[in-house]
Structure formats: structure tokens, C-alpha cells
Amino acid sequence: MRIGIVVDSACDLPQDFIQRNNVIVLPISVRIGEAVLADHRDEEATLSFLHAHVAERGHEAETTPFSVNQIRDLFLQRLVIDYDHVFCLTISKLRSQIFDNATQASFAILNDYKPVRQAAGHTSPFALRVIDTLNLFAGQGITAVEAVRLRAQGLGVAPIRARLEQLAEHTYGYMIPRDLYYLRARARTKGDRSVGLIGAALGSALDIKPVLRAYRGVTEPVAKLKGFEPSAEKLFAFTVRKLREGLMTPTVCVGYGGELAELHALPGYAALQAACQTQGVELFESVMSLTGMVNVGKGALAVAFAAEPHSFSA
């Protein structure tokens, strides 16, 4: 059984992990003014687009997910030949059209795949499952890493699916934006009310940073802390505590809206790296996707893991 794993480009995982494990990426296109980039998780392209466009006018960006027809074409031209079963793991359907587009495309794919597969010499049926990760950005990485692990262990489709759906329900994505003015401007552009609890002007004047939590599809502020670096340090320390209590998978994903050297310099990050090593947990760090950066702003930090239900505490 050849199992394929598909994510969208909002999923924050390192480029080399994606390539090494043949994870297929559905690109999300980002347009700022006349500049357009289809995000294929290329960190250099993301950083150069960030420096050229996102920092100044990112809040005006329009993001366009892969359409129903584009998803259908990708599957019928390639994936129904290369794989027997595909898991398509998407960003929370409350944040994007991708889940709905992929679900709609799946009907056409399952209708039309037989002649394509037969021409390639495959007589067995093809199947796919679209799974809402119920999370975003670094949070999407948790289920994707586990899908790669379970596939490598040779597990069957049914236990993989059950495990991924269970994990999605237990994934926590924590995020600290650096610039509340940007976040408010972006929320206005999108008509998004999930960050409406933050008084942006007040927050920026006092250097208050919200800790946002994505969990079971909902994104909401769960704490207000003072200063970006102290807030990052508290989030890393909280993650270390959860690590020691025991996570549901040996995975922590970190996304940063800029150069990774800046992430490495944040207080508390070295302690998180050391704790991961001691506890046998893999730490995946990546430059945040372009989609992530235009939505939460340059220099934002996201940390995700799967754990039993809990509350955030600094």
C-alpha cells in the first residue's frame, strides 16, 4: 500500500523534512499589490518576499488557496498514479477554504481516477481522506509529522486515519504576535473577529502581547503578557513543562516569522532545545509560511504540540 501525505503550504515544517519524506504541498498564493508568490515552502523565497513586501503592506495581502480544479488536476495527473491512498491534511476549515475545496475535489477525483490508474498499470482502487487538522501553521505540523512516522512504521490506512483524527483533537498551537497594530489591521482587512479582544493601541503602548491559542478549530487569546521576548521565554518554559508531563507524540513544532537566527537568540529557546533532547522529543523549526506571516505579522512566534486538555499558564 503506497500512502501519500498532502499538506497545504500554511503547514510549518522544515523544507528538508518535506522533501525527504515526499510530502506534497498544496501551495497558497499570496498577492500584495502587484507582487504574487505561490508559497511552496521555500524558505529563501519566503524571506525575500517578507523583506520586500510583507513588512510594509502585508496586512493588505490577499491569499488564494488551491482551487477545487487545481486540487483535482494535481491528483488525477500525479497522485492517483503515485499512491494507492492519500491523506490530505488541511489548515482548520474555520480559517480557510482549503478543506472545503479538497473535500469537493475528492468527489471528482474518486469519480474520474480509474482510467488514469489503469493506463499506468494499476488495477487496484484508489482512496483519499481529507482531514481537518483543526489547527494552523505550526499546529498543522504535528499531524503531518505523525502521518510520516506511522507510514514509515508500515501501519495500515485505518489505524493511521484514527490516530490522525484523534491527534487533531488534541493539538495545541500557541502563538505570540510581535506587532498588534499589524494584527488589528490584518483582522480588519479579513473581517476577522477572533483577535477583537485585544485593544491594539493600548497593548502596543504598554508592550502587552497576547498569547493566542489554536485548539479544535478555534483561535482565541488565552493570556496577555508584557514584552515580546519575556513572553516568548514564558511560552518556551510552558512548553518545557508540558514536555516533562508527557506529550501525546514526541514532537514539538516551532514556526518563526523571520530568520531562524532570530528564533535561536530568543530567551528560553536553548532550554527548550535541551529539554527536547533530554526527553527524546523531535523539535521541528521552520520559517513561518507566507500565509502565516501575512496573517499574524513579521516576527511572530508559534509553538505547537499534542497533549491532554490543559490551560495555558505563564
From Swiss-Prot:
The molecular function terms in GO held by this entry are:
lipid binding
Keywords (A to Z) from UniProt: Lipid-binding
Pfam families to which the protein is assigned, alphabetical: DegV (PF02645)
DegV domain mapped to chain residues? 3-307
* SUPFAM superfamilies reported in the protein's UniProt record: DAK1/DegV-like
PROSITE patterns associated with the record: DEGV (PS51482)
The domain of life is: Bacteria
Positions that bind hexadecanoate: T63, S96
What NCBIfam families does the entry give?
Answer: DegV (TIGR00762)
Q: Which PANTHER family match?
A: DEGV DOMAIN-CONTAINING PROTEIN DR_1986-RELATED, FATTY ACID-BINDING PROTEIN TM_1468
Q: What does this protein do?
A: May bind long-chain fatty acids, such as palmitate, and may play a role in lipid transport or fatty acid metabolism.
This protein's name: DegV domain-containing protein XCC3382
Organism, by scientific name, is Xanthomonas campestris pv. campestris (strain ATCC 33913 / DSM 3586 / NCPPB 528 / LMG 568 / P 25)
